[in-house]
């Protein structure tokens, strides 16, 4: 797979995550939804947003490098997603959903590594990992309880 496949693979992953959340919450979610953040407010496009604007999700379809090392630049992009999510009000449930990808070299998934390394930056953001082949979402940090979310 070449880097030119990344945008399509990322978009496919995003759509699968949206479908999973729609089934989980029995609600409609929008892709690439703009929400005003900051002061003065400026629109930012979040990957997936609940129609009632109570859930915002950023999707990260990252993998370990071929040699099992950390994709450092991609972790910076995940931190940027956390930064934007942090500007949303407390009424939002905020999620970073990462592709389930595991390496024996470190005996952990990339989402587990991300949370372990950057939890001081994550705050009230839920970190989940999704296995699209088996349609399984796993919580790394947070609670994906459906009561009163949206």
Give, region by region, the residue ranges found by the protein language model.
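Alpha-helical scaffolding within the catalytic cores
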Residues: 42-44, 80
């Amino acid at each position: 797979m070449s880097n030119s496949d990344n945008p399509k693979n990322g978009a496919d992953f995003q759509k699968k995550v949206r479908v999973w959340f729609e089934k989980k919450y029995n609600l409609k979610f929008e892709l690439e939804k703009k929400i005003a953040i900051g002061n003065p407010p400026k629109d930012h496009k979040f990957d997936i947003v609940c129609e009632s604007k109570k859930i915002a999700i950023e999707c990260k379809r990252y993998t370990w490098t071929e040699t099992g090392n950390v994709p450092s630049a991609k972790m910076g992009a995940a931190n940027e997603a956390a930064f934007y999510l942090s500007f949303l009000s407390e009424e939002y449930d905020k999620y970073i959903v990462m592709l389930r990808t595991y390496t024996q070299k470190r005996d952990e998934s990339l989402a587990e590594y991300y949370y372990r390394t950057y939890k001081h930056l994550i705050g009230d953001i839920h970190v989940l990992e999704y296995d699209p082949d088996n349609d399984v979402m796993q919580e790394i940090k947070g609670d994906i309880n459906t009561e009163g979310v949206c």
